[in-house]
Design a protein with these regions (language model features):
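Short glycine-/Asp-/Thr-/Trp-enriched loop segments that recur within the blades
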Residues: 8-12, 188, 240-244, 300-306, ...
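Hydrophobic beta-strand segments that make up the repeating blades of beta-propeller
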Residues: 29-34, 115-116, 208-213, 250, ...
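Asp-box/WD-like beta-propeller blade repeats and closely related beta-sheet repeat scaffolds
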Residues: 238-248, 267-312, 332-333, 349-357, ...
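Beta-propeller blade signature
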Residues: 278-285, 333-341, 392, 451-453, ...
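Solenoidal tandem-repeat scaffolds enriched in leucines and small polar residues
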Residues: 294, 298-369, 375-377, 382-384
Length: 649
């Protein structure tokens, strides 16, 4: 801490600061706003004390019309073998601004090789061999040419067909605030829909799709016609179940009659128990008309109520994952392995054939894949506060081989999983979506994120305290106000914010309560791929930085650019967080070009054409009647988005 050495250690209550070169000496001064006191002005004496002869350049812009300051312009310099860029955006909040001029520190370099300004109207001007240590003024009226653009050798790989191929569907999630029940839970769990499934449901050889509904919104089946358009079909059974919230779905032949039936997972975090949390199996009459199969004794499904998260279907088995126990975030919910008798009747065989799978964790997604090439499908499950869990099929049972597969030390907030051969060796690899690295919450093996779950101070309600490391110390993320709301008895111990200060969880919670608490850990938040070594183990590799900007809720693998190598499309975002954490909205969809060896590089938006905003929950590949390939994107509280993939040549 160099505050005292730099002269910035004056006591006060400050809520704003701005940098500005007030005396035009090339050193940025500091103005600090104080409550109930005059503003403080700190003169920067760096130039007075500079013995190394450092240099600067300040650029003032004069723009057109009302934009007199050239706001939005980009100023770039090349000097001393390095490049710098300043985008003129001086606003820093309500009625707040920094110095609107572009300031460049040049170090020992006394001349700028080139200075380029790109104005908001895309015109530009270039100056060369500019002397340092001065303020220069450039006017937009002197800009005479547009900047050179790099010609594109190929059109974008994706084009948005959403408006040209309209589908009469928009997910309409109801408003429910999970924090009202559990104020200390890390994030909402009530925005996990909509479900999405693709398949030929009426036997005409064309792909159709199912889009799930929210509470009080029925799901819908869309049949594709010969022109490649989609129309909704009447489904009375869906309307009867419109109270349920559809978070995942799968199309498969459940009853062995040759057509695709529909399994829909009920979830959300609003319902405590009862019928809205019962999964549903809808049987197909072969023409795309669905009727609900009964649950219970003699029915198609066993009766179970859960906050479901996913469905993974294989030939004989269904894995149904659960995310949370209502009002008890952090308690491991029950998940299910269901076995099909071949005629559409499923029984719960979890305890019999997959010991430990019932309490596998807070499940997000799962997939079936024969990862070791023995001809039998294995189950891989991902979720929050858990490693990638591997259940290997052995003699008709599923045995936990997580440690043997190499995933024991990879606990995260995993959000999605996709199996594909990413490096061309004939073995299935995994694409694993996670929280990403653009988060206030950090996690590593040395400094994991932790969740302490317990009835602290014995108030009769379960509470969750999330901690993360800062400067080598693990602190709760919740502030004094949030903790006092959940545990009012703390008020006498922490009457002021100063008294709460840098309190650790062991300072806040009694030792006996901490000993009894359930502690969950996460040590990696990076989205990754897991390459199959061929010996029953996987090797994790983080995806490129561009894939870490937001959580990845959906991914697709395929050769999207026609070079014969597997590429990836990823999408995500998540808004249901506290203001402190800040919503995750930095993903606009991403194409990752594969090199055929398991390496991936991000493709810029101009080349890919992808622009997928919003909270993506599922993506699926679909073939149109004319042979064109589409990506269908299901987004929370939004329309279905359709992205056409450029034909392969």
């Amino acid at each position: 801490n160099l505050a005292a050495q730099w002269g910035l250690n004056a006591a006060g209550f400050s809520n704003g600061a701005a940098y500005v070169d007030l005396d035009n000496d090339g050193a940025l001064d500091l103005v600090v706003n104080n409550l109930n006191a005059p503003a403080t002005v700190y003169r920067n004496r760096a130039r007075d004390l500079d013995s190394a002869g450092h240099h600067f350049l300040t650029v003032t812009l004069r723009g057109y019309g009302a934009n007199t300051g050239g706001v939005g312009a980009k100023v770039m310099i090349a000097a001393g073998g390095s490049h710098q860029l300043v985008e003129v955006m001086p606003t820093r909040g309500f009625e707040s601004s920094v110095d609107p001029r572009a300031h460049f520190g040049l170090g020992a370099t006394s001349r700028v090789d080139s200075l380029t300004v790109i104005w908001p109207d895309r015109r530009s001007q270039v100056l060369e061999n500019v002397a340092a240590d001065r303020i220069i003024t450039l006017s937009q009226s002197d800009a005479r040419s547009h900047p050179p653009t790099r010609p594109s050798a190929h059109p974008p790989l994706f084009s948005d067909l959403t408006d040209r191929l309209p589908i009469s569907y928009k997910h309409a999630d109801n408003t429910f605030f999970d924090f009202g029940r559990e104020p200390l839970m890390p994030h909402l769990l009530s925005t996990e829909g909509p479900a999405l499934a693709v398949g030929d449901v009426n036997g005409d050889g064309r792909d159709d799709m199912y889009a799930g509904g929210a509470k009080w919104q029925a799901g819908a089946v869309f049949l594709q016609d010969a022109a490649g358009r989609f129309r909704a079909t009447p489904q009375p059974a869906f309307r009867a179940d419109s109270l349920d919230e559809d978070v995942d779905a799968a199309l498969f032949d459940a009853d062995g009659d040759g057509d695709l039936d529909l399994y829909v997972v009920s979830g959300g975090n609003e319902f405590w128990e009862g019928a809205p949390l019962q999964d549903r199996l809808y049987l197909n009459d072969g023409r795309g008309n669905f009727s609900r199969a009964e649950a219970g004794a003699g029915g198609a499904l066993p009766v179970f109520f859960h906050n479901g998260s996913c469905i993974a279907a294989s030939g004989d088995f269904l894995f149904v994952g659960s995310r949370v126990v209502a009002r008890q975030y952090g308690v491991i919910p029950r998940s299910y392995l269901l076995e099909n008798d071949g005629h559409g009747h499923f029984r719960d065989v979890t305890a019999l054939k997959a010991p430990g799978l019932d309490s596998v964790g807070m499940v997000s997604r799962a997939t079936w894949v024969d990862y070791d090439g023995d001809g039998k499908l294995d189950l891989i499950v991902v979720g929050e506060w858990m490693p990638v869990r591997v259940f290997h099929q052995e003699n008709g049972r599923f045995v936990d081989r997580t440690t043997e597969a190499g995933f024991a030390g990879a606990s995260g907030w995993w959000t999605s999983i996709q199996a594909a051969d990413l490096n061309g060796d004939g073995r299935p690899d995994l694409v694993l979506g996670n929280l990403g690295l653009n988060s206030l919450i950090r996690a590593s093996r040395a400094e994991p994120a932790r969740l302490y779950v317990g009835d602290f101070f014995e108030t009769g309600t379960l509470k969750q305290i999330l901690t993360s490391y800062r400067h080598g110390v693990s602190y709760p993320l919740a502030g004094r106000d949030e903790l006092l709301q959940a545990m009012p008895s703390l008020r006498s111990r922490y009457p002021t914010y100063a008294s709460f200060g840098a309190s650790r969880i062991q300072d806040i919670i009694p030792r006996k309560d901490l000993k009894q608490a359930r502690v969950l850990e996460a040590d990696t938040f990076a989205s990754a791929i897991a390459l199959n070594r061929g010996d029953g183990t996987f090797e994790l590799h983080a995806l490129p930085a561009e894939a870490q900007f937001a959580p990845i809720y959906a991914s697709l693998a395929g050769d999207f650019d026609g070079d014969g190598k597997i590429d990836l499309v990823t999408a995500g975002n998540f808004y249901g967080v506290t203001p402190l954490e800040g919503r995750y909205d930095a993903s606009y969809g991403l194409l990752l070009r594969g090199d055929g060896r398991g390496g991936f590089a991000a493709v810029d938006m101009e080349q890919s054409g992808l622009a997928i905003d919003g909270q993506v929950r599922h993506m699926a590949l679909l073939k149109r009647a004319n042979g064109d390939r589409l990506i269908v994107v299901a987004k929370n509280n939004d329309r279905l988005q359709l992205e056409q993939i450029a034909p392969l040549h």
